[in-house]
Amino acid sequence: MKAVAINGYGTVGKRVADAIAQQDDMKVIGVSKTRPDFEARMALKKGYDLYVAIPERVKLFEKAGIEVAGTVDDMLDEADIVIDCTPEGIGAKNLKMYKEKGIKAIFQGGEKHEDIGLSFNSLSNYEESYGKDYTRVVSCNTTGLCRTLKPLHDSFGIKKVRAVIVRRGADPAQVSKGPINAIIPNPPKLPSHHGPDVKTVLDINIDTMAVIVPTTLMHQHNVMVEVEETPTVDDIIDVFEDTPRVILISAEDGLTSTAEIMEYAKELGRSRNDLFEIPVWRESITVVDNEIYYMQAVHQESDIVPENVDAVRAILEMEEDKYKSINKTNKAMNILQ
């Protein structure tokens, strides 16, 4: 049973902590917070040992009546590995601390690939992180792209990908972000960061462009893929049906928007209404000459969570076969495929 520390108990960290706790070969030995807020209290209610990320703030937690087990430094002493779920840019700064402590670490997609040196996606390049000291789980959008592009590449050979990414403006709890009434090219030039990020884990030719829109629910992707071997629509459906963490949805079933997909996620009865899988609209799958078209959605708060679990097994050399790790994680988390 491997001991996992979660540095940063926010949108991603709290989900990763719960996913780790569901596994039978690893456990959460502690989570960290910078502020004594409601999430800190909820962590304690869930039975997680709570550590203070900024030592100078220990007294703030004590004043708030929140019991802490120590500082992040203390937490790392108890762990085999740390999953850094801190805000963008903080993880790279924490890397020095992890190196000094001699502890292996997993970072999130907000960090730059160049700063960490290695990126991770369960299906695309699990083996590259096996036994390594540090890796970075690619971003939510990149994870979503890799989930569907990797099996297409394996099955038909990708010549080129062009993807238009419609990004949510903020997560539901981010009251300080927007836009409220605008569509923002992000950036107003090619490429968006998503294409280069895909290339850190999957060796394909890809260009991406993105816009930010005033919604908080999900991202949405419009993907065009030129392939070496032209498939039929049924061939593509078969590939997606056989791909872990990808599900086919249908507008005929009432799933015509990201809002309805999130309603579907609620009906699954999961904590926080998470959708770990990448839903692909069945009706959108089209083949014209040697080009595949399809539309998919990404629940930005949760799709990267199972990848973090697999990354633990890869780095700590707990499982060499990526499919065995994926299946083990999926079963523990009740992932649909």
UniProtKB/Swiss-Prot annotation:
InterPro entries: DapB_N, GlycerAld/Erythrose_P_DH, GlycerAld_3-P_DH_AS, GlycerAld_3-P_DH_cat, GlycerAld_3-P_DH_NAD(P)-bd, Glyceraldehyde-3-P_DH_2_arc, NAD(P)-bd_dom_sf. D-glyceraldehyde 3-phosphate binds at S139, C140, N141, H194, G195. PROSITE patterns: GAPDH. One of its GO terms (biological process) is lysine biosynthetic process via diaminopimelate. NADP(+) binds at T11, V12, T34, R35, G110, D171, Q300. Keywords: Cytoplasm, Glycolysis, NAD, NADP, Oxidoreductase. CDD domains: GAPDH_II_C, GAPDH_II_N. Pathway: Carbohydrate degradation; glycolysis; pyruvate from D-glyceraldehyde 3-phosphate: step 1/5. It is found in: Cytoplasm. The active site is at C140. It catalyses: D-glyceraldehyde 3-phosphate + phosphate + NADP(+) = (2R)-3-phospho-glyceroyl phosphate + NADPH + H(+); D-glyceraldehyde 3-phosphate + phosphate + NAD(+) = (2R)-3-phospho-glyceroyl phosphate + NADH + H(+). The keyword Cytoplasm applies. Homotetramer. Exhibits a dual-cofactor specificity, with a marked preference for NADP(+) over NAD(+). Belongs to the glyceraldehyde-3-phosphate dehydrogenase family. This is Glyceraldehyde-3-phosphate dehydrogenase. It comes from Methanothermus fervidus. The lineage of its organism: Archaea, Methanobacteriati, Methanobacteriota, Methanomada group, Methanobacteria.
